Amino acid sequence: MSTAFLTLIAVIVCILFRILNVHSQPLKPSVWCLDAHFLDCLYKIAPVLREPYIPPRLWGFSGHVQTVLHSIVGRVRCPWPLGERVYMSLKDGSTLTYDLYQPLNEQEDDITVAICPGIANSSESVYIRTFVHLAQCNGYRCAVLNHIGALRSVQVTSTRIFTYGHTEDFAAMVEHLHQKYRQSRIVAVGFSLGGNLVTKYMGEDQKTKPDKVIGGISICQGYNAVEGTKWLLNWQNFRRFYLYIMTENVKSIILRHRHILLSDEVKARHNLNEREIIAAATLPELDEAYTRRVYNFPSTQELYKWSSSLFYFDTIKKPMIFINAKDDPLIPEDLLHPIKEYATTRQNTAYVEVAHGGHLGFYEGGFLYPNPVTWLDRTLVAMVGSLVMMHEVGKVAP
């Protein structure tokens, strides 16, 4: 066997070891929290936060592998919870749907978990189904917002789809749930884009929210779209590749409903160029060609600033828990500094940072094969319980 061949094998092995990050060890999550009472309640109901997160040994310490597996596989042996689809007609002519799942086990408290999925996702997304099933088994009712345009089986009936910052659809679902279950307390849970929407919704003081909304949980959001898009346009850490995938997902929804979203009347009204929309290779290009025009923003920078939850932190009145992974390839550490500062200066707020997990991955398991339920699923269910307990015992600071 030649020296050159052996050298090549050695280089490949070194690259694989570096990508898989196999030298890493399981670590306990880091928690930023000013409020001692809040933190005590969180640890009491979610003791998993005191324990090391142990991903699959071979590949689980790589944020890239976790992220790619999440986007391709989602979860293993995923259940398909049985629920009902609720249809709502909004004032702008949009057809909004959400899927409603009743608890499988009785609990003393009537709790509804209002779930906002990630970009272009819905109740049919595998990671959402896994979390819903686990929450049902723990006695929680779940409602999952289907982002307008995301479901192939539901036609778009107005000239818009979801965006990164418009919270009206989520607010409409929460209000409908409140009218339907008057005594139920509501915990809002958002994943990625949904985390931004939930946080922004909680901080929009000009919008009236039901008093039964007792808190929110945000997972894997970037907080600041203005700065976040700059990072995503960089090829470092393969971010430009991830941005391309997200762009194609949103673009495919627009083109799937082009007979309404890109009708001649709509294109004339908003000065849309269909060729520019089709040619867009990044979200900023797509938002310049489509989103900011449909919503009448003077620039994408204005759209991104208005959409970013970071600028609504100071007006959040209810308890919030934020979760991010340090190795999330979509969200660099620089974007996490503001949430750390916020959590250490505000009551009723906690920020949990996990060393590994990627973007919405957080798989657990042995050497190779992951468990059906992830660390994130288990932790979120416990966090919902901690918010409920804090509300009940009156430890939420005024």
Swiss-Prot record:
Q: Which organism is it from?
A: Drosophila melanogaster (Fruit fly)
Q: What class of enzyme is it?
A: hydrolase
Q: E.C. number, please?
A: 3.1.1.-
Which terms does the UniProt entry file under GO BP? acylglycerol catabolic process; lipid metabolic process; medium-chain fatty acid biosynthetic process; medium-chain fatty acid catabolic process; sperm capacitation; steroid hormone receptor signaling pathway
* Membrane-side (Cytoplasmic) residue stretches: 1-4
Any single Gene Ontology cellular-component annotation = sperm flagellum
Q: Which InterPro entries match?
A: AB_hydrolase_1, AB_hydrolase_4_CS, AB_hydrolase_4_sf, AB_hydrolase_fold, ABHD4
GO terms, molecular function: acetylesterase activity; lipase activity; monoacylglycerol lipase activity
Please list every transmembrane segment annotated in the UniProt record, as residue ranges: 5-22
Q: What is this protein called?
A: Abhydrolase domain-containing protein 2
Name the active site residues. 192 (charge relay system), 328 (charge relay system), 359 (charge relay system)
What PROSITE patterns would the database entry show?
UPF0017
* Cystine connections: none
Question: Mind giving the lineage of the organism this protein is from?
Answer: Eukaryota, Metazoa, Ecdysozoa, Arthropoda, Hexapoda
Q: Which gene encodes it?
A: Hydr2
Identify the residues that the record assigns to the AB hydrolase-1 domain, covering every copy: 113-365
